[in-house]
């Protein structure tokens, strides 16, 4: 009997070790999705999966999921460091009645979304909804037609870095990018480079805890403000913009209020063009501060100039 029990224990240990090894082997560093794939596959290049969600469980933390060919690869929730890359294909997400991508990872995780078209189908919630991560990189993407939320939403309780580059965020019912942290001492650091925000309510809505730097961007044809910096309580919102176009918005090109702080700078030789906005080129609301260099062009707006602004830099 004791020999039988010993044999059973050995078999149980062997089974556990085999299962552990199998799970480890299933977590590949690089996996693949395809429009003709199947999520029962191992997500290898020769046997790809069908969806991001199907591949993510088979991809190790810090790994990468690549799109082999054009396809709609479905909404996905990300809970670890990972890269989704659709570069060179027409990789897309059709997010009807849901968020396109939800990021709820550890506060030490880095997530990269690259080369993906994210379509809200006129009833989606948010294009990318960021709840927690250390850093989120959005590169070479198009995010559009989310009618109950924002193109990119950040609602974070910890510090977070958001880097958006070479991306179009358009035609969303609420904001193109909306950032806020609920932690009084926390901050969201946002870098925008060559980002086009158009056809939203506010192109950029930087709320409490937001620290934004934007360059070579376009904030145009939004129904309210091109850029809106506002905050509540002691946690300020700061936006620094240079070498950008802020035009044809339904209310103001730039608005700062509710303890918001916007620094509109043309740096040394570059300019911001703030023109043809319906109400004001620049509006300083209660509690707001706008610092402006002299090399911004503020013309053709309902109200031009920069009343209430503080001049900084050369020539002031």
Protein language model regions, located:
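Sec/Tat signal peptide C-region and signal peptidase I cleavage site
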Residues: 21-26
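Extracellular beta-strand solenoids
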Residues: 67, 78, 86, 103-105, ...
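Extracellular beta-strand-rich solenoid/capping regions of secreted or surface-exposed proteins
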Residues: 60, 73-85, 92-135, 148-157
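Acidic Gly/Asp/Thr-rich repetitive segments characteristic of extracellular carbohydrate-active
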Residues: 35-74
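Bacterial N-terminal signal peptides that target proteins for export
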Residues: 2-12
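Extracellular beta-strand/beta-solenoid scaffold signature
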Residues: 95-104, 121-130, 146-156, 171-186, ...
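Right-handed parallel beta-helix
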Residues: 88, 109-120, 134-146, 159-174, ...
């Amino acid at each position: 009997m004791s020999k039988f029990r010993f044999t059973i224990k050995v078999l149980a240990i062997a089974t556990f070790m085999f299962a552990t090894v199998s799970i480890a082997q299933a977590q590949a560093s690089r996996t693949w999705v395809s429009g003709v794939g199947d999520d029962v596959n191992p997500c290898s290049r020769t046997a790809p999966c069908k969806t991001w969600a199907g591949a993510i469980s088979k991809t190790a933390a810090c790994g990468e999921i690549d799109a082999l060919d054009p396809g709609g690869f479905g909404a996905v929730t990300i809970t670890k460091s990972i890269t989704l890359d659709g570069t060179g294909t027409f990789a897309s997400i059709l997010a009807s009645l849901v968020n396109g991508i939800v990021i709820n990872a550890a506060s030490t995780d880095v997530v990269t979304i690259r080369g993906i078209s994210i379509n809200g189908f006129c009833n989606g919630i948010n294009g990318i909804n960021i709840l927690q991560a250390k850093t989120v990189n959005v590169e070479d993407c198009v995010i559009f037609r989310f009618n109950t939320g924002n193109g990119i939403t950040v609602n974070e309780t910890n510090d977070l870095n958001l880097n958006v580059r070479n991306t179009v965020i358009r035609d969303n019912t609420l904001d193109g990018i909306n950032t806020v942290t609920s932690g009084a001492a926390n901050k969201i650091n946002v870098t925008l480079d060559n980002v086009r925000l158009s056809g939203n309510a506010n192109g950029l809505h930087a709320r409490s805890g937001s620290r934004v730097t934007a360059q070579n961007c376009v904030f145009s044809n939004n129904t309210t403000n091109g850029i809106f910096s506002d905050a509540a309580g002691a946690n300020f919102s700061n936006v620094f913009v240079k070498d950008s176009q802020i035009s044809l918005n339904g209310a103001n090109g730039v608005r700062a209020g509710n303890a918001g702080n916007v620094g509109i700078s043309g740096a040394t030789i570059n300019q911001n063009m703030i023109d043809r906005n319906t109400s004001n080129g620049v509006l300083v609301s209660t509690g707001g501060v706008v610092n402006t260099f002299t090399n911004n062009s503020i013309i053709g707006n309902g109200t031009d100039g920069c009343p209430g602004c503080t001049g900084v830099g050369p020539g002031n």
